[in-house]
UniProtKB/Swiss-Prot annotation:
Pfam families registered for this protein in UniProt: Ribosomal_L27A
Bias-annotated ranges (Basic and acidic residues): 79-93
Listed name of the protein: Large ribosomal subunit protein uL15
Species: Leifsonia xyli subsp. xyli (strain CTCB07)
Keywords for the protein's UniProt record, in alphabetical order: Ribonucleoprotein, Ribosomal protein, RNA-binding, rRNA-binding
Entry similarity comment: Belongs to the universal ribosomal protein uL15 family.
GO biological process, one term: translation
Biased composition (Low complexity): 9-54
Top-rank lineage group of the source organism: Bacteria
Subunit structure: Part of the 50S ribosomal subunit.
Function summary: Binds to the 23S rRNA.
Length: 210
């Protein structure tokens, strides 16, 4: 029995040694793999640290100014509304196109100036009487009081002299009227003189030449 135990122990020792050797061999690659994983992790930390520095540099840089351009502009929501094309089927008021049935507004449109059938305004207003004479002659008017002011010592009154004194405009007819009094001698030669003005001029010793 003692010999059997010793032989069994001797046979078991090599088996145990082999088992421990295989266990150590399995543990060694696991440790190496863990070390390899730890090394890239450390490298990753260093790599990750570099972008942090880069981002810090970017933060330090001045922000880029945003410029508003024409192509950035857009109409407000709901501002652009498509026009309804009526009369293009039952979905778009296809029968009467929103005009109703019969009548002037259904066929075309009310003419400009139509006032609902009542007498139009241009027919209700009264007409201007008379007419404008196409042969009417317009005169520039000069009264005797103005002549007394312009000619305090008397003299010859002509259209050219009155134009030179600024009393009338040139190239237009002149008429002397009798408003005011005259006490000096005037020789009047203008286009027309009223009856009262002629009497006063002659009474003051002057003359009238037409």
């Amino acid at each position: 029995m003692a010999d059997d135990k010793s032989t069994n122990e001797a046979a078991a020792k090599p088996v145990a040694e082999k088992a421990t050797a295989t266990a150590l061999a399995k543990k060694a690659p696991a440790k190496a793999a863990a070390a390899d994983k730890a090394a890239p992790a450390a490298k990753g930390e260093t790599v990750a640290a570099k972008p942090a520095k880069a981002s810090a540099k970017k933060d330090v840089a001045a922000p880029r100014e945003q410029v508003l351009k024409v192509h950035h502009l857009r109409p407000a929501a709901g501002a652009k509304k498509e026009k309804t094309r009526v009369g293009r089927g039952e979905g778009s008021k296809g029968k009467t196109a929103g005009r109703g049935t019969k009548g002037t507004k259904a066929r075309y449109q009310v003419r400009p100036g139509f006032q609902g059938g009542q007498l139009p305004f241009h027919m209700r207003t009264p007409k201007l009487r008379g007419f404008k004479n196409p042969f009417r002659v317009e005169y520039q008017v000069v009264n005797l009081e103005k002549l007394a002011e312009l000619y305090p010592a008397g003299g010859d009154v002509t259209v050219a002299a009155l134009v030179a004194k600024g009393a009338v405009r040139k190239n237009e007819k002149v008429k002397v009227l009798g408003n005011g009094d005259i006490a000096v001698k005037l020789n009047v030669a203008v286009d027309k003189v009223s009856g009262s003005a002629e009497q006063k001029i002659v009474a003051a010793g002057g003359s009238v030449n037409r």
